[in-house]
Amino acid sequence: MLKKKAKTKSSSKKWSSFKNARSMHVLLYLLLAAIMFALLFVHVKPETLDLDLFSVSDKTIYAPATVEDQKATEEKKQAAEDAVEDQYTLKKEYTDNRIDLVSSIFDSISEVKKSSEEGSKSPSEKSMVKSVKDKLTSDVNDSISEDSIKTLLKADSEDFSFVRDTVITAVNTVMSSEIPSDKLSDAKDKVEKELKSNSIPSKYLGAATEIGRFAIIPNYVFDPKATEAKRQEASDNVQQVQIKQGQVLVEENDLIDREVYRKLELTGLLNNSNLFKPISGLLIMIGLFIATLVYYFEKQKQNLKFKNQSILLFSIITTLLLVIMEVVSLFQKMEYNNIGYLVPIAAGAILIKLLMNERIAILGSIILAICGSMMFNQGVTGTFNYVIGIYYLISGISGVLFLGKHNARSKILQTGLFVAFINMVVVLSLLLIQNTALSGLEIGTLMLMGVVSGFASSVLIIGLMPFFETGFGILSTMRLLELSNPNHPLLRKILTETPGTYHHSVMVANLSEAACEAVGANGLLARVGAYYHDLGKTKRPQYFIENQMNIDNPHDKLSPQLSKNIIISHTTDGANMLRSYKFPKELVDIAEQHHGTSLLKFFYYKAKEKGDQITEEEFRYPGPKPQSKEAAIISVADSVEAAVRSMHNPNPERIEKLVRGIISDKLQDGQFSECDLTFKELDTIAKTLCATLKGIFHSRIEYPEATKKVK
C-alpha cells in the first residue's frame, strides 16, 4: 500500500514537473496543429472518382478547382495563327531600281547613237542594234524587241528625251502604288494607259510601252518576319482556356466520352496525384495560426506553468468547437448545405474571453471562422465558404464585445440573446447580398438557425464554465460569487470561530471593493479576497485582539518573539488552508501577501524595550509583497480598518490623515514596489477609502442615558 502511494506521488511529481517544462507548450502547439490538420484535411482533400471511359455518370460532376485546359488553349492559339493573313511589304526601293533600269536602257541607246554620230563612218543599223544589246542584260534583251531599239535609235534628240522622261514618269507613278504579284498584269496595263495618255508620238508608243511594261514588277511582296510577328501576336492575345471551379463537367446520366474523361483527368478527379498542393497549403495556414499563437503567448508576462495552462485551455476550447463543427458538417448535403448556421460558434470566443482575455478571444474567433469556412464548403465553388466564415467571425466577435468586462451568469444569457439577434441580422444581410433565390420560408429557417446558435452558445458556456474553472483553477465571476456565499464552509468557520475577525473582514471587503473599482481593478476579487484574507486566525483565534472578548490578552504572558511568531503565522496558515480547499491562486496570494514584508511594530518595540538583541528582519512578515493591485489595496484597507476602529471619536479630518499616513508608511517601506499601482491611483484609493469610512463612521445623534425611572 505504501509502495503504491509512493509510486502515485512520484508520477504526480513527474507530471507536475512536465507541466512546468518549456517543452510542454511546444507539445501543446504540435498537438493543436495535428488536431486541426486531421479535422480540416478531409474538407480540403480533392474528391476522386472511380469512373470508366464510355460509362454513364451517376451524378452531376463539378470541377473542384480552376485549371488550364492546355490542349484547348493550344488549339485556340493555332486557330488564331491560321486566321492571320500573309503580311506584305511595299518595297519602295524596287521603284528606284526599275527607274534606274529604264534610264540605263535609254542611256545605252543614247550612247550608241552618239558614238555613231561622232564616228567618221556611219555603222549599219544592225550593228548599232547589236551594240545596244551588248550593253543590256539578257533579261532586258529578252523583253525589249529589236524593233523598239531601232525605233529609238532613229528618234531625234528632242523626241528621245521626251519618250525617256515620259516612260520614267509613268513607271514611277505606277510603281508608287502596291503591286502584288497577282495584280502585275493590271499594273502593266496601267503603265501602258499612262503612256498613251501622255501624247507620245505614235511611232514611239510601241517602244515606250514595251519598255514601260517590262519595267513594272511586283513591289508588294510577302514579308515572312511580319507575318510571323502577326501570328505570334494573335497567339499571345488568346486567353487561357480554363475549366472553371464549379463548372459542370458532366451531367447526371450523361455518357463519359473521351473529351469528358480528359477533363476529369485534367481536374484531378480520377487520381490522387494532386494532393501536394492542398496538403502544403493547409500546413502553411495551420503554421500561421500556430505562429500567431506563439507570438501572442510569448509576449505574455506569465510564468511557464500558467503559460502552459493558457495554451492548453485555448487548445481545448478550440478543439471542442472544431469537433462540434465536424459533427454538424456530417449532416450537410449538396441540396441543403446551410446547416453550419446552427453551430454555436460564439461559445468558443466567449469561453476564451471569460477564462483568458478579450484579445486572445478575438484571435480565436478569426481562427475558428477560417476553419469553419473550410468545414462547411460543400455545395460552394472552392475550398472556402466565405459566407459561413463571415457569419462565424461576426457572431464570435460580437459576443466578445457585448460581454465586455462582465461575466455574471445573467450577463452570459443576455450575451446569448444579443448574439442570437446579431446572427439573425447577419444571415439576412448575407442572403440579400448574395441575391439568393431562396423562398421566404427557407430564409426564415436560416435566420432561426442563427437564433438557435446564439442561445445554444450561452447554454454551452454556462454548462462548461464550472468544468474549466475546476479543472484549471481559474477564477471567474461565477466562481467568485460562489465563494462569497456566506454558507461556504470556510466563511462559516470564520464567523463561528472568529466573529470579530469576520466583522473585520466584511469591513475590509467593503473598503477594498470600493477602492478597486475606483482604480479599475477587480472589485469582486478584492471583496472575496478580503473575506478570506485572515482565515489563518481561526487556528489561534484568542491571540488576535478583535476576538478577545471577556478574556485576558494571552500575549501579556508571552515573550515578544513568541507573540510575533503566532501573529505572523496567520498569513501562511491562511494560505495553506485555502490551498487545501483548492481555492484559486489569486485568493491564496491575497491571504499570503496582504501584510507583505511589513514590520510587526508593537512586538518589535516591546522586545526592544526589554533589551533583547533583535533585528527588524526578525519581526517582519515573510511576504511576499503584494503582487497585484487587489492584494495591495486589501493590505491598505486591512490596516486602515483596524486603525480607524481603534480611533476615539473619528472625524473626517482625522480619518483622512490616518489613511494617508498608512499609505505613506507602506509606500516608504517598499510594500508597493512589486505591484503596478501608480501615485495617482494611490491618491484615488485614499480618497475612496476616506469617503467610504466617512459613510461608516458618520456622526450620530447622542441619545441621553435614561437615568430616571418611571414612577
Curated annotation (Swiss-Prot):
Catalytic activity: 3',3'-c-di-AMP + H2O = 5'-O-phosphonoadenylyl-(3'->5')-adenosine + H(+)
Keyword Plastid in record: no
Sites where the protein binds Mn(2+) 1: H504, H533, D534, D638
Segments of this protein annotated with the region Disordered: 114-133
Keyword Manganese carried by entry: yes
Family matches, as InterPro entries: HD/PDEase_dom, HD_domain, HDIG_dom, Metal-dep_PHydrolase_7TM_extra, Metal-dep_PHydrolase_7TM_intra, PgpH_phosphodiesterase
Pfam families, A to Z: 7TM-7TMR_HD, 7TMR-HDED, HD
GO molecular function: cyclic-di-AMP phosphodiesterase activity; hydrolase activity; metal ion binding
Transmembrane spans: 275-295, 311-331, 336-356, 360-380, 384-404, 413-433, 448-468
Record EC number: 3.1.4.59
Binding-site residues for substrate, renumbered to this chain: H504, Y621, D638
Localization: Cell membrane
Class of this enzyme: hydrolase
Cofactor: Mn(2+)
UniProt topology in membrane: Multi-pass membrane protein
GO (cellular component) term, any one: plasma membrane
Residues that bind Mn(2+) 2: D534, H570, H594, H595
CDD domains referenced in this protein's UniProt entry, alphabetically: HDc, MATE_like
Effect of loss of the gene: In strain 168 grown in minimal medium and glutamate, 3.5-fold increase in c-di-AMP levels, while a double pgpH-gdpP mutant has 4.2-fold increased levels of in c-di-AMP; double mutants die on solid medium after 2 days.
Family listed: Belongs to the PgpH phosphodiesterase family.
NCBIfam families per record: HDIG
Function: Probably has phosphodiesterase (PDE) activity against cyclic-di-AMP (c-di-AMP); may be the major c-di-AMP PDE in the cell. In B.subtilis c-di-AMP is a second messenger that mediates growth, DNA repair and cell wall homeostasis; it is toxic when present in excess.
Protein's UniProt name: Cyclic-di-AMP phosphodiesterase PgpH
Organism annotation: Bacillus subtilis (strain 168)
Lineage: Bacteria, Bacillati, Bacillota, Bacilli, Bacillales
